[in-house]
Amino acid sequence: MPPPVEKGFVAVGGSGQRAIAGTTLPVPYTVSVTDDAAQPVAGATVSWTTAAGNGSVSAGSTTTDAGGHASVLHTLGPASGSQTVSATLGASTATPVRFSTTAVSSAPAARVAEVAIPANYGIHDTFVRDGLAFVCAWNTGLIIYDVGYGIRGGSPSSPVEVSRIAPLQGSVSGLTGAIHNAWWFHHPVSGEKRYVFLGQEGPGVIGSASRGDIYVVDVSDLVHPQQVASFGLAGAGTHNFWMDEAAQVLYAAYYNGGVVAIDVSGTLSGDLSSRLIAQVKPGGDDSTYTWGVQVANGSVYASDMVTGLWQLSLASAGMGVMSGRRVPDRWTSDLWVTGGFAFTGTWGGSLRRDSTGTLNPGNALKAWLLQPSGAPVSLPDSLILEGVGTVSDVEVSADGRRLLLTAERGPAGGFFLYDLADPLHLRFVASVAEAGGLHTGTFAKIGGRDLVFAARNPGDPALVIYDVTGALQ
């Protein structure tokens, strides 16, 4: 049988990065080679040469793998500006592929502060609003920092603790500590900023079991926060939140309990179980383990570790399942919906076996196109991050221009920023490597600067704050 005829030769990743001159890019340039039947060609030789910028490549030539992909790393030259590398396919007449990167003289992301967190497991999510950072410090509880609010004279480069609180044992979960996430509620009618909702993430088993309650903390006096109410579901534990503040409804991902909607209008005290509006398990009783939830475009979107991405109706419309798309090859993690697109991360605490028998880590970002009805349609190409095992947090900047990913479980852990000018073709902008990776990250704008508040955990837990103003311009 004659060898396949090499026909397709295209770039599939790495172009359009932005990095400091003289450094090696974090994402390799990658080409794809296919035959006349559009099937990948293995064993093809691809030659790489620097075309502009006086940089270097990690190899003069590489060979395509079973998927038809060949890659090389580019070390930038010393000058700022555009730097390019050309890829040529063996003796083929295929047009060479050119990759371009912008070299800059200073880092597009710079660390401005690091706040040590007690190693009582450490730090999980951080919620930032109005110059206050609400740090979920697991068994230590909630720690509130002034990072620009003014009550303690703190700033992003010099956070100052305002107060802390360790909630009591959960009335349903029976657990103490394990404070995982927070949301500071701004009342749309009264203007009150009275309540912070806290989520408790207890032990669990993917697909079948979890524990953890929701706590309500009154922060009318920021210096002396008080626990005033709680909510729990027997046999299930909460994970991430989203608030429809206009409707005064808290939506909570509840792992094997699915998604719940809670009425949080008025004064909150005691047991809030009577305020449950609706509950739905998107994948059914035996296939639901919901990680995250978000209200967007008049729907509720839920990312489920076992089944994928779901569209639900709002609580006011009964919160039923409207549509969904399954992700069977990896465990799904966080989500973010922006305009007509959605993005979901993947978790790699344990590998997941796909239909071919391959065990896959959680190193993929899944992109979704939302139909006019809001129903998600999975796009064929995922973003694969080499050197990480989990894409743990996903967020889009307030202006919709940048996508933030945090990653861990591998040598390339940290955070990554991508340009969303064309959501179908993400363009790498910047990354920051952090030993041990970053578990969570969120955007904030304080004093005219764009920031990322990230959690390094466990090992040497810390709240790490980066100025990414240059990367968001």
List each language-model region with its residue ranges.
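The feature marks long extracellular or luminal low-complexity segments
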Residues: M1-S106
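Feature marking well-ordered beta-strand scaffolds used for ligand recognition
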Residues: V104-Q473
